[in-house]
């Protein structure tokens, strides 16, 4: 292993019940089929594949108020939290292949149980910070951040399946990038808690270079700490990731997405990565599915050091001919 190589633990989370559309549970399968593990190994990373979690059906999972599938989502996240904690205890960077974005509850909880001073970068068209009481859809993939924030303790009712969750990050520990579809209740929460965000307006105004400079300065300025990148592929414009459940026009470009992941890699502090909401059933054509999957793979590889300028091994490529 070279000095740049990382120890990575990959866990698939084929789960879809945080939202209504079938197919997102196939995310781990299509990402693996695209050669993600082989491509990481080509970069001389030490990759351990922990396989895919298996989620049991939860009978009689009646809604809580309007929140759908609460027990299934709660239980799946508890399983994922345990798996991610195990990967972190083994000294590896956790790579979670989703699945819908409700799984960030488990991924970040498990990560924070081992690395408590976590910083979270959340790339998404949405803030995913509705509470079970502010949600208008009842879909838990729009609520994960509300379960994770200490400041919202007391604002979250006792949802069946979630008794294991302890809020593990503060409002000052998270930065959003790519926002462009935020509910009024979510906007109120983000503003009231003073959460740092770069909506597409700020990305347009500042450019992605400045956005990343400010993001990393804000999260790491006082001290270096582990970074958890939770990447919803709908953060990118639907022209690059069409096969996803809640696409919103006017998103991050492919180049901006890659720049975000390159900048995080360069800190040397990436400690956990979620690649979420790839849904192969929602591509209108096979090409749309391929485009989405290839983009998700490229974002992952850039997070682990694949650079657009090229990469080379630490050898002398110019040794004289024999």
Swiss-Prot record:
Residues 1-26 are annotated as: Disordered. It is found in: Cytoplasm. Mn(2+) 1 binds at residues 101, 124, 128, 232. The modification N6-succinyllysine is found at residue 17. Substrate binds at residues 126-130, 137-139, 183, 246, 277. It catalyses: L-arginine + H2O = urea + L-ornithine. Its EC number is 3.5.3.1. SUPFAM superfamilies: Arginase/deacetylase (SSF52768). Belongs to the arginase family. One of its GO terms (molecular function) is manganese ion binding. The modification Phosphoserine is found at residues 7, 62, 163. Mn(2+) 2 binds at residues 124, 126, 232, 234. Pfam families: Arginase (PF00491). The keyword Iron does not apply. Binds 2 manganese ions per subunit. GO terms for biological process: arginine catabolic process to ornithine; urea cycle. GO terms for cellular component: cytosol; nucleus. This is Arginase-1.
